[in-house]
Design a protein with these regions (language model features):
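C-terminal capping/lid segments that line or modulate ligand- or cofactor-binding pockets
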Residues: 1-36, 519-530, 535-539, 646-657, ...
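Terminal accessory carbohydrate-recognition/targeting modules of carbohydrate-active enzymes
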Residues: 1-432, 789-790, 808-895
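Active-site-proximal structural scaffolding
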Residues: 94-96, 267, 350, 354, ...
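Extracellular glycan-targeting catalytic surfaces
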Residues: 372-373, 383-385, 395, 462-467, ...
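Extended glycan-interaction surfaces of carbohydrate-active proteins
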Residues: 427-468, 490-509, 557-598, 641-733, ...
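Structural helix-adjacent loops and short alpha-helical linkers that scaffold large soluble proteins
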Residues: 427-433, 467-469, 483-496, 527-544, ...
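Alpha-helical scaffold segments in carbohydrate-active enzymes
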Residues: 442, 497, 542-556, 612-615, ...
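Aromatic-rich carbohydrate-recognition surfaces in CAZymes
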Residues: 469-476, 480-587, 599-607, 678, ...
C-alpha cells in the first residue's frame, strides 16, 4: 500500500475480541499489535456477558461518526430497555479518548451496577517463535526466495488468496509468524490432484545469499514434513534430504550462495527459515516459543475522585493510562487472554473477596485458561441508581498522563465530539426507518479490525462482521457502497484495499471467498458520486488489471478455460456466487463435476464489469480500451444466449461439458428439471445480456409470488422448484445483496414500480426486525420474515442504507448500471445532473430525492419534463432509450 492511500485513524473500534476502543501500536506495526480498552457494564450479581465481538453479547452499535472521533453502542442489562447502558468514545486529543457510560434504570426498583474497564496489549497470537543465531550468521525467512514454483500449476499461482505472497501461510509456530509451503485450500479443484509442495517431482524454490566472511559456512534449514517419508531435493546437482519430522526441525545442507532446491517428489514439506552459519556454531541456533510482551508494570494512584492507573510495557514507547472519575474505583487482574475465563458472577461483584476471577465455586468445575494473555481490570463498583433515573460515569483512556477534570468538563468533551453524529435526516415518509438504518450504519462503520495481513504489512480492514478475521472479496464491494452513503473517503479506502497495480506479481486484486467482482459496481457508484473524476483516475488501471484477470488474460487466470465466452471462477473457490447452498452448486459438488460445469452468474457479472469499464474509459478518454470491452461484451452475451438458455423452464442453466470442452447440455435433476431455477438462472438480465421474450420470461419469474417474489423479497431459489427448501442458508432466505443487483436492473429497465416494491419490502422487514432486536442480520427467512445468522452484520446487508437514502434522503441521486453521471450538483431543493445513457433497454429510470418541503419542476436540456413523485420529495424520471443523456435540472416550482 503506497503513501497516496487514505489513512485510517490510529484510535478506533479495531478489536477482534471485545468491543471498546483500540490504539494501533505503530512501533510494533510489524507484529500487528494493538492496545484494547473494553468496557463491560453489568448489574450486581448478574450474568451480563462481556462484549465479545464474535457472538451475541447484549451490546448493539448505536452511532458512529465517519471519522471515528465519536461512536457509541447500547448495552442491554435488562431486556428490553428496562436497564441499559449507553457507552460512547469521544476523541479528547490525539492521545486520548473519553469513555462515557450512562446507565438508565427504567424500572420501578433501585439498581446496583458495576462498570468494568479491561485493558490489554493484544497481538495476533499470544506466543511467537524467537529465533537466536550466532553473531555474524545470516538469517533469512523461507519466504525471502528468488523464485518459488510448482511442477503442477495452481490456478491461483499468480492470484494468491488472502493478500499473501506465493506459497506464504500464517502460523505462529514459524519465524515471524509465516511459513512457506502449500496451505491454500484446493478441495474445490480435486480434479487437479494437487499434492503438497515437495511431494510432486519438479517443485522448486530458489535462494540467493549475499557474500559473507563465514569460514566454514553451512545452511541450517528449519522445516517440517507434511506427508510420510523423507523429503528429497536436488540442490544444484547434489541430493539433500530432509528427514521426516512432524514437528519443526533443523536440517543442514551445503552452503551455496545461489541455489535451487528441486524436489524429487518423495514427501511434502514446509520451510520456515534458512540460516548461513559457521559449521562449528550450528548448535547455537535456537528456536523457542515465547510469550508476547503483554504483561505491564502497573502503578496506581488514588485521587480524590477516582484512580489513575499507569500501564507500562517494555516494547511500547509510551505508557497507557486509565483515569476514573469515581472514588469507588478498585482494580483486579485476569491472567488470561479470554475474559470468558472469568466467572461471570465474579465480574459482576465488586467485592474484594471475588477478585480471584477464574476461581470456581465448586470442585465440580476446573479453572479455565483458554488463551495466554493478561487483562488489567479497573472497576467502579456499587453504582446505585434510583428508579427511572440515569447515572453517568467518565473514564479517560490515554497514552499521555491525563489531568482529572470536572464532570462538567468531561461532559463538554462528549458533547463536542458528538456534534455532527445525528442520524440521517430523512423526509417524513422515511422517518420510521431512522433507528434501524442508523444501527446498520454504525455497524458498517465499526465492523473494522486490525491487524489483517496484506502483502507485507498489517492493515485496518472493514469486515462483514467481526467474527470474520479475513478479507472478503464480494462482501467488500457492498461494504464500500454502504460506506459511500456516509463517507466517499471510506468507500475509496475500502475499494483501493482490494485493487493492485502491475508491480504486484503475487495477485492483481485481493481474493478471498466467492469471486463476485463487486469492486466494479463499487467503483462505478463512487465515480458517479464524485464530480472530480480525475481524482479517481488512478484506480482505472488497477481495475483494468482485475478485469483482464476475469477475462482470462493475465496472472495465469483460468476464468475463460472453456474458450467459448462463458466464464467460471470455480477454480478459485467452491462458490462462484456467494450463495453457499445454492442447489445447482451443491449438486455440482456432490457430482464432483466442477471441471465440467459453468454457471451463469460469473459471466453476467463480468459482462457488467466490462460495461462499467467502458463507461469509465469513455469518461477518461481511454478510447482504445472501449473496443476491447465491446468485443468482450458481445462475445459473452452471445455465448450465454446460444449455450445456456433453457427454453423449457425459461431460465438460463449451468452448462455441462465433455472431456473435449464441448457443451453437452445444461444441468438437470433426475426428472429433467433445470437445476438453475433461481438467482443464477436469471442473472443475465443484470448484465443487460438478454432481450425480447427471454427477458420477459425472466421478469415473470422474478415477479411471480409463487416463484421468486416471496413475502420476504426475492428468493435465491425459485420456490416452485423441487429443490427449494425453507431452512437453508441462502435456500429459503432472502439476502439484500443479489436483490440489490436486481433492483438496479429494474431501474435499467424502467421498472420503477417493482424497483420500489423491492426496496420498500426490504426496508419494512429490516425495520421490524432491527427495531425489535437492535440486531443487523445477514438474511431473512421466507417462512418467518425474521433475521438470521450473524447478529452484528454489515457487509451484504448494506443495501438497506442505500435504499433508505435513495427514496428518503434529500440530495440523493440514484440510477441503474447503464447511466453515467458526469456531475451531480444538489442542494436540499434543487439538482443539476449531467448524465449519459449507455444501455439498450426500452426505457430506464433515475431517482432524485430532494426535500419534501416544496414542489418541483424539472427540465431536460431546458425542456420541461414530467416525473413521478414516488414519495413526497422522491422524484422518478423514466426516459425512453432514445434519450441518450443531457442535463437534468430540478428546481422549486414557484407557481
Amino acid at each position: 500500500m503506497t503513501d497516496n492511500k487514505i489513512k485510517m485513524p490510529v484510535w478506533g473500534p479495531y478489536s477482534k475480541k471485545y468491543m471498546g476502543i483500540s490504539k494501533i501500536i505503530n512501533e510494533l506495526a510489524d507484529k500487528g499489535a494493538r492496545y484494547d480498552f473494553s468496557v463491560h457494564p453489568t448489574l450486581w450479581n448478574s450474568s451480563t456477558p462481556v462484549p465479545n465481538v464474535t457472538v451475541p453479547s447484549n451490546y448493539h452499535l448505536w452511532n458512529c461518526k465517519n471519522d471515528y472521533t465519536f461512536y457509541s453502542y447500547r448495552y442491554e442489562l435488562m431486556w428490553k430497555d428496562e436497564v441499559y447502558a449507553d457507552i460512547s468514545f469521544s476523541k479528547a486529543d490525539d492521545d486520548a479518548y473519553l469513555m462515557r457510560c450512562e446507565i438508565f434504570n427504567n424500572t420501578s426498583l433501585s439498581q446496583n451496577c458495576i462498570l468494568n474497564i479491561f485493558a490489554s496489549l493484544e497481538f495476533p497470537h499470544p506466543t511467537y517463535c524467537e529465533v537466536s543465531v550466532p553473531s555474524g550468521a545470516i538469517l533469512k525467512t523461507a519466504n525471502d526466495y528468488v523464485d518459488y514454483s510448482y511442477a503442477v500449476a495452481r490456478p491461483w499461482d499468480e492470484e494468491n488468496p488472502d493478500g499473501m505472497f506465493k506459497g506464504m501461510f500464517a502460523d505462529k509456530e514459524f519465524y515471524l509468524g509465516k511459513g512457506l509451503g502449500d496451505r491454500c485450500e484446493n478441495y474445490h479443484v480435486h480434479f487437479l490432484n494437487l499434492k503438497p509442495f515437495g511431494f510432486e517431482s519438479g517443485d522448486k524454490v530458489s535462494y540467493k545469499f549475499d557474500d559473507n566472511d563465514i569460514k566454514n559456512p553451512i545452511i541450517a534449514v528449519r522445516y517440517k514434513t507434511v506427508t510420510d517419508g523423507d523429503a528429497e531435493f536436488d540442490m544444484n546437482g547434489k541430493t539433500v534430504v530432509f528427514a521426516h519430522s512432524d514437528e519443526l526441525n533443523i536440517a543442514y545442507i551445503p552452503y551455496m550462495s545461489e541455489f535451487t532446491l528441486e524436489s524429487h517428489g518423495k514427501a511434502g514439506i514446509e520451510f520456515d527459515f534458512l540460516c548461513v552459519v559457521d559449521e562449528s556454531e550450528k548448535e547455537n541456533i535456537t528456536c523457542k516459543t515465547k510469550a508476547q510482551p503483554y504483561m505491564p508494570q502497573i502503578e496506581t494512584k488514588v485521587l480524590e475522585n477516582g484512580h489513575i492507573t499507569k500501564l507500562t510495557y517494555d516494547t511500547v514507547d509510551k505508557p497507557f493510562y486509565i483515569l476514573t472519575n469515581n472514588k469507588n474505583t478498585r482494580e483486579r487482574k485476569l491472567d488470561s487472554g479470554c475474559l470468558e475465563d472469568a466467572l461471570i458472577n465474579r465480574l459482576s461483584n465488586g467485592d474484594h473477596t471475588y477478585d480471584e476471577l477464574r476461581e470456581t465455586f465448586s470442585a465440580s468445575f476446573q479453572r479455565k485458561h483458554s488463551d495466554d494473555g493478561f487483562f488489567h481490570n479497573s472497576l467502579i463498583k456499587s453504582i446505585f441508581i434510583e428508579p427511572n433515573t440515569s447515572h453517568v460515569e467518565y473514564v479517560m483512556l490515554s497514552q499521555s498522563e491525563p489531568k482529572q477534570l470536572s464532570s462538567e468538563e468531561y461532559e463538554a468533551i462528549y458533547q463536542n465530539a458528538k456534534k455532527g453524529s445525528k442520524p440521517a435526516s430523512f423526509n417524513k415518509a422515511g422517518e420510521k426507518y431512522t433507528l434501524s438504518t442508523e444501527i446498520l450504519k454504525s455497524t458498517l462503520l465499526t465492523n473494522v479490525v486490525y491487524p489483517v495481513y496484506r502483502h507485507g504489512e498489517n492493515v485496518i480492514h472493514h469486515t462483514p462482521g467481526k467474527r470474520w478475521d479475513s478479507f472478503y472479496t464480494w462482501d467488500s464491494g457492498f461494504i464500500g457502497m454502504g460506506l459511500l452513503e456516509f463517507s466517499p473517503k471510506l468507500c475509496q479506502y475500502a475499494l483501493d484495499m482490494y485493487l493492485c497495480d502491475d508491480t504486484n506479481k503475487d495477485f492483481c486484486f485481493l481474493l478471498h471467498g466467492s469471486l463476485v467482482p463487486t469492486q466494479f459496481v463499487e467503483y462505478l457508484e463512487l465515480l458517479k458520486r464524485t464530480n472530480d473524476k480525475e481524482s479517481l483516475a488512478f484506480l482505472y488501471d488497477k481495475a483494468k488489471l482485475y478485469y483482464e484477470f476475469l477475462r482470462g488474460r493475465n496472472h495465469a487466470s483460468t476464468v475463460a478455460k472453456f474458450n467459448n465466452g462463458l466464464l467460471t471462477t470455480y477454480d478459485y473457490w467452491y462458490s462462484h456466487c456467494g450463495m453457499d447452498d445454492y442447489p445447482a452448486q451443491v449438486e455440482m459438488m456432490a457430482r464432483k463435476s466442477q471441471k465440467y460445469t459453468c454457471p451463469c452468474l460469473s459471466t453476467a457479472q463480468i459482462i457488467r464489469a466490462g460495461k462499467i469499464m467502458k463507461m469509465v474509459a469513455d469518461s477518461l478518454g481511454r478510447y482504445d480500451d472501449i473496443k476491447i470491452y465491446d468485443e468482450d461484451i458481445e462475445y459473452s452475451t452471445k455465448a450465454l444466449n446460444d449455450l445456456a438458455w433453457d427454453e423449457e423452464s425459461g431460465y438460463f442453466g449451468y452448462t455441462e461439458y465433455d472431456e473435449n470442452g464441448n457443451v453437452t447440455g445444461i444441468m438437470r435433476t433426475a426428472d429433467g428439471e433445470n437445476f438453475n431455477k433461481g438467482m443464477d438462472g436469471v442473472y443475465p438480465i443484470v448484465a443487460g445480456a438478454v432481450e425480447g421474450e427471454r427477458k420477459k420470461k425472466l421478469l415473470e419469474h422474478i415477479k411471480n409470488p409463487n416463484e421468486m417474489w416471496s413475502a420476504a423479497g426475492i428468493s435465491a431459489v425459485d420456490m416452485s422448484a423441487s429443490y427449494y427448501f425453507d431452512d437453508g442458508y441462502w435456500n429459503g432466505n432472502v439476502w439484500m445483496s443479489h436483490q440489490w443487483f436486481i433492483w438496479k436492473t429494474m431501474l435499467d429497465n424502467g421498472e420503477a414500480d417493482f424497483a420500489y416494491d423491492i426496496a420498500k419490502l426490504a426496508l419494512d422487514m429490516w425495520k421490524d426486525e432491527t427495531d425489535f432486536t437492535y440486531n443487523t442480520y445477514e438474511c431473512f427467512g421466507i417462512a418467518t420474515k425474521r433475521g438470521g445468522w450473524f447478529h452484528n452484520f454489515g457487509g451484504l446487508s448494506a443495501p438497506i442504507c442505500i435504499w433508505a437514502n435513495a427514496y428518503f434522503k434529500p440530495q440523493t441521486v440514484t440510477t441503474g448500471f447503464d447511466v453515467w453521471t458526469d456531475y451531480q450538483k444538489t442542494t436540499d431543493n434543487s439538482a443539476n445532473i449531467k448524465f449519459k445513457y449507455f444501455g439498450n433497454c426500452d426505457k430506464y429510470t433515475m431517482i432524485i430525492t430532494l426535500s419534501d418541503k416544496v414542489k418541483y419542476v424539472a427540465y431536460l436540456d431546458g425542456q420541461k419534463i414530467d416525473f413521478n413523485e414516488r414519495n413526497k420529495g422522491s422524484l422518478e424520471f423514466t426516459f425512453d432509450k432514445n434519450v441518450k443523456g443531457g442535463v437534468l435540472e430540478i428546481k422549486e416550482d414557484q407557481e
